[in-house]
């Protein structure tokens, strides 16, 4: 493909990475548990936000064994605010497999790592290359963006065939410094060749082999398939309080936000009369509606348009768990969709 020589990529990238990389806490270790944790946290979450969570998580659960034995509520509380809670549930499941099958020692073979719950090809490649210097690529959105521009390829980068092709071509040129090369590709895609903005081609160590730069197309790449429109769902959320306590309930063990605490809620936007009738159906006696607040929360494929009703009830019953404000803050992991209403309440407490 024109003048593209991928074999030059390691020799161009590695010196640049060693001189210019950001200092991040998970780059100071070869411990596979730490690297695995950071990679899972960094999915769908900004680097700056992850730093604090990463430190707190490892302080509370410093070993795979501690993670495997952690109580679910405590685990969810450590993860609170990161979202995508299936990530942390799979972390625990994988830790339990490591404890039972590998005597607590993180497996060092790619196929064994890939077989762990919640670990796909990207995470397995990242852990194995960074922790063990195995020559296996870790192809994420950053790497796909870099490769699309390097090769001047307009194929949508979210197609599985494109990802497989990138992985195969990278595997053929992996150097013995596999961990540094993996991180160099990620770093280039996160900084110089970043998303949603003009690439900084003048600062790029790869511009002399980059076809996108040579052809003037780098700014138009990468291409993605059209996004599916999010489904809109209306919900009414009840922030029920009695004598300084608030009603919470656990969500079902499977599905969206599985096993997490929530304020009672129902489908649709209820008017005052229907809302009061719903509270009575819950087995509670409503006293006074204190206020109503509108919020929205976006999941990957769904948008919740929520009407929050703050309401005082006569007794703390109805089959709910009743928490003080202090207990909610210390013990109950509220997903962001519901924490929006709790933060509103805390401002007024």
Please give the residue ranges for each predicted region:
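Intrinsically disordered, low-complexity, charged terminal extensions of DNA damage-control enzymes
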Residues: 1-22, 28, 190-349
